[in-house]
């Protein structure tokens, strides 16, 4: 009933994504608009010490760049295509998987072929008795892109009945029997990963690292240095359902 409702919603979501208008293509006469969003801000379960932070080189597509590496002991995973580690957050029931394709495998090719089988193979490869020495660069992902229409992608994934009135099942939302989603949009949020933890629109406390490590890092047989383009996944602790996936290319 509020003719300005869409404008208010647009403003609120634009602030969240550090972007301008994101709902320009929506029809103001549509009666139902459903949004799902998250803004994760947390520190690491095992904090870094200042001695764990050092400068190093990263091999980006544009050549070598200087980055800040964070060194820690992390859960180790591996497939015949990639190497990965898992990090845990202290308050939210989430963890972060960082995945680097093997030498000779481009990130684009790996991401294109990244299937549920590869994902579960990584998770199943965990040996709880072993850890790796992981060197992960601090990085950030900009959320300055406008909303992307992902209707066709969702339909092709098998959830096509949601967009067809005679096949959708949303009767509890209305007295009408012909409700269906007209479109689905995705907006990439801003995200930063550093020694303090993970941050979205809020600061994650980038001064949260310890002045001095109280317990020395364990000696490991494996060292994984994420010094070339990689993927990362924010996933649920218990179900391993991915909530956010992205890439860092330098």
Q: Model-derived features: where do they sit?
A:
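Short, solvent-exposed loop/turn and secondary-structure capping segments
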Residues: 45-50, 108-111, 245-246
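Internal alpha/beta scaffold segment
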Residues: 101-128
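Non-catalytic, conformational "gating/processing" segments within enzyme and secreted inhibitor domains
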Residues: 1-102, 129-214
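Extended hydrophobic
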Residues: 79, 83-99, 217-250
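Short linear sequence elements within intrinsically disordered, low-complexity coil regions
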Residues: 115, 119, 124, 175, ...
